[in-house]
Amino acid sequence: MTQANLSETLFKPRFKHPETSTLVRRFNHGAQPPVQSALDGKTIPHWYRMINRLMWIWRGIDPREILDVQARIVMSDAERTDDDLYDTVIGYRGGNWIYEWATQAMVWQQKACAEEDPQLSGRHWLHAATLYNIAAYPHLKGDDLAEQAQALSNRAYEEAAQRLPGTMRQMEFTVPGGAPITGFLHMPKGDGPFPTVLMCGGLDAMQTDYYSLYERYFAPRGIAMLTIDMPSVGFSSKWKLTQDSSLLHQHVLKALPNVPWVDHTRVAAFGFRFGANVAVRLAYLESPRLKAVACLGPVVHTLLSDFKCQQQVPEMYLDVLASRLGMHDASDDALRVELNRYSLKVQGLLGRRCPTPMLSGYWKNDPFSPEEDSRLITSSSADGKLLEIPFNPVYRNFDKGLQEITGWIEKRLC
C-alpha cells in the first residue's frame, strides 16, 4: 500500500457529520424573492444562510473579518451538498461554515490566553464567543458540529465574564417535568438588588449573543439583564418549543423572588423576533410580575398564520422554525398548520385588553414582522407605544431605536 493510500486509510473519517442545510427535509418553494431585514440580515445568491452583517458587527465583529471568513468558504473546492451554495461544504474541513468560523474563533481564544491585561483578555474571549456562535448559526437541532461550537462559545463567554466590568452569575432554574435550564444574570456596578430585564431572544440566536445589549444600553442605566436560551437550543436544548412558548421564561419569572440580586418588583421583558411571542405571552399571563414588555420586530401573528408572508421568508428561516418545532421532515402544509397555532391572536390573547405596558418597534416592509403585528400589540395594551424605526442608515437607526426602547423600559422600572 502506498504512503498516500495508507494516510487516507488512517485518517479517513469514521462517519460524516450531517451538513447543516440537510438537517430539515422540507419540500422547497423554489425560487424566492431577495430578502433584506435589519434584524436578520439578507439573502445573498449562492448562500444557504442569511448573512446577518448588522447583528454580527453590532456584536463586535469587524466587517473585514466577516469578508475574510466568507472568502475562505467561497474559495474552497471541497465537496458540497449543493454545488450552487457556498456554505454547504460537507465535513469539518476547510471551506465548511462551522470549521472556518470556529477556526477564526480559535485565533481570538489564543489571543485571550496570551493577553496579560485582564480587561483586554476579556474582550478577546467575548470576541471568540461571538465567532463560535456564528459558527453554530442557525443552531439547527441535530447539528453535531454546531452543538460543539455552542459549547465552546459558552465556555469562552464564561471566561469573558470573569474579566469584563460588572458581575455575571450563571444560574440554574428548575422547571417541573423536565431538565433544569441555565441562565446568565448580568449585573452592573453598585449594590443590588437591581431592576432587571428578562431577555427573550430570537430563534436563530443564543443567549450569549446579547452582551452588547446589556453593556451599551442596560448597564449604563443601572439595569441588570437575565438571559436564558429559547427552547430546543443551547442550555434549553432538552425542551421542545411548544404553543406554550413562554413556559421556561414563566418559571424563571416565578423564581426571581428567591434571587437576592434581582429586585423582583421591578422586572421587564424584552423580546426580539420570536422572543416577542414569549414576551407578549408573559405580558398577558404574568402581568403582576412584570412592569413592562418591549418588542422589536415581533413575530406574533402574521408570519405564523399568513401563507403569502411565509412564501416571502428564506428557506433557512423556515428550517429554523421547523427545527424548533421538532418537524424536521414534515411537509410545508403540516408546518403551516402547526405554525398557525403559535399565533397569539389565534390563541385568543392578542386583541384582548392587557394591563401590562407594551412597546413594539418595527421597520416598514419587514418580511418577518409587518407593522400590523406591532399595532396589534400596542393597541391591546392599556399603555401601548408604537415605534417605527427607519431602515437607513441601518446601524445608526438600530442604535437610536434601542436607546429609545431602553429609555422607555427605564422609566417603568426605575
From Swiss-Prot:
Keyword Hydrolase: yes
Entry EC no(s): 3.1.1.1
Source superkingdom: Bacteria
Keywords of the record: Hydrolase, Serine esterase
Catalytic activity: a carboxylic ester + H2O = an alcohol + a carboxylate + H(+)
InterPro entries assigned to the protein according to its UniProt record, in alphabetical order: AB_hydrolase_fold, FrsA, FrsA-like, FrsA_esterase
Chain ranges passing through the membrane: none
UniProt keyword Hydrolase, yes or no: yes
Molecular function GO terms recorded: carboxylesterase activity
SUPFAM superfamilies: alpha/beta-Hydrolases (SSF53474)
HAMAP family membership: FrsA
Function description: Catalyzes the hydrolysis of esters.
Record family assignment: Belongs to the FrsA family.
Descriptive protein name: Esterase FrsA
Species assigned in the record: Escherichia coli O139:H28 (strain E24377A / ETEC)
